Amino acid sequence: LVTLQAAYSMSALNRGLLPTGGKSQSLSFEMTVPGSQLEFFRVNYSGQIFFPLTRLFTLRLRTDLGYGGTFGGTETFPFYKHFYSGGMGSVRGYESNTLGPRTTRSPNDQFGEPDPVGGNVLIEGSAEVLFPLPFVEDQRSLKAAMFVDAGNVFNTNCPDISTYCLDLSEGELRYSAGVSITWITGFAPISFAIAYPFNRRDGDESEVFQFELGRTF
């Protein structure tokens, strides 16, 4: 497939690692050439902003939004372009990339668990209060946070036979709250989080303690 792509990004953060002020955002767009075998488009926006509350405390707001659609003779958005949600950097307290629509269980497989398949709509947001840890000499390399996360992925074109497909609905957003620590080491950033998913539904895969290597704010 021949695709057309465009992207925009800007950063006005006060520092590259563990910022305490400023903002950053990025926007990407992709679409296939009209007349292609598959005709679809995909747009994704990510943004974050930091508000210093006091000398020690900072409020961070983050959002990640995505939408994929079709045009021409294509009716279904391709699964390999789906968005995923859950995990570190997303909705903590849920296992990575497990939220949202799932495969429909086969009549011959009554005991297997449906697999996450993502969706063509992504909605995520976070609010965090960042603060230093006491008795830490270099505060620029270690930061703690109290956070609330919300989000999910959805499918706006659910097949009639699907039993685990989530259409766009505010009531299907998942929420979590917890604490996290990010440490900038000489090897790579290390992040830990303890999160409580407080509206977990049947079938959701929760994960209270999470760890990730290589991600900062």
PLM features per residue range, with description:
Residues L1-L142, M146-L166, G203, F211-T216:
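C-terminal outer-membrane beta-barrel translocator/porin domains of Gram-negative envelope proteins
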